[in-house]
């Protein structure tokens, strides 16, 4: 195997402005101290909740069902309720919502009634990444494994990274790591438009297959989203892609950032 590098032309990364103007440091209003997570039982939401607790925010959450994930959050001192109730928004400065949560959820309705920022999970993750040197990993398969390897290598090198991964990392004992270093490793789900909230320094593309067509409709639209994501990389950054994947090789010509390839045959 090997690694090769090419340079592409640079252009505007483009920015998705869907988040509210009130969103500031860490994607939250400057005075925010307590954040409530609706749908906190998912691996992505729980990881962000755990990270924000580690950063010193007061964190609470709710989910329809109790699980091993919600039990772990409780062990960390996070107040997690089972079911949904408007009362649980009381005291929160902002509310983060899972993609699985509908707009008519009682807690979301109450948050809007109180004029609280209601922040999608992807926007919250992007807010956490904003002040860091971010490595974002996406692809149809291998996201958790690859992002875990990147985070563990950075940690073993003494760089003390933060990470939010879509699976438990044995070396961390969690899907999340809160570090003091500048690096932030995230698993970016290509099935969600929130992929385009991120502006990473490095994007890693593992592979691309015709999945998630229930969301995108066509494989072409999925390809478009991944190409847009790659071009959101900072102009001094790089896109690392697997040269063994034919779809990524075809996508490569649409990438305007510096490209580094890897693979068994590369």
Regions found by a protein language model. Give the residues of each.
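Phosphate-binding loop of NTP-binding sites
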Residues: 51-54, 74, 88, 99-258
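N-terminal leader/targeting and accessory segments in enzymes
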Residues: 1-124, 246
């Amino acid at each position: 195997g090997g690694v090769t590098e090419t340079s592409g032309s640079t252009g505007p990364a483009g920015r998705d402005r869907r988040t509210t103007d009130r969103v500031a440091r860490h994607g939250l209003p400057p005075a925010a101290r307590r954040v409530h997570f609706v749908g906190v039982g998912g691996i992505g939401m729980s990881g962000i909740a755990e990270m924000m607790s580690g950063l010193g925010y007061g964190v609470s959450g709710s989910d329809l069902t109790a699980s091993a994930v919600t039990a772990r959050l409780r062990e960390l001192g996070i107040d997690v309720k089972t079911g949904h109730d408007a009362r649980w928004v009381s005291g929160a400065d902002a509310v983060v919502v899972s993609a699985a949560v509908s707009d008519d959820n009682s807690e979301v309705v109450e948050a809007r009634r109180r004029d609280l920022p209601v922040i999608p999970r992807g926007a919250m993750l992007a807010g956490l990444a904003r002040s860091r040197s971010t490595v974002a990993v996406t692809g149809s398969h291998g996201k958790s494994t690859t992002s875990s390897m990147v985070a563990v290598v950075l940690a073993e090198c003494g760089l003390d990274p933060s990470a939010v991964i879509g699976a438990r990392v044995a070396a961390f004992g969690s899907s999340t790591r809160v570090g003091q270093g500048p690096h932030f490793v995230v698993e970016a789900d290509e099935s969600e438009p929130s992929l385009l909230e991120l502006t990473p320094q490095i994007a890693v593309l593992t592979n691309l297959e015709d999945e998630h067509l229930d969301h995108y409709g066509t494989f072409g639209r999925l390809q478009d989203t991944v190409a847009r994501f790659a071009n959101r990389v900072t102009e001094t950054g790089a896109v690392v892609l697997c040269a063994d994947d034919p779809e990524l090789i075809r996508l490569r010509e649409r990438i305007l950032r510096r490209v580094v390839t890897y693979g068994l045959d590369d």
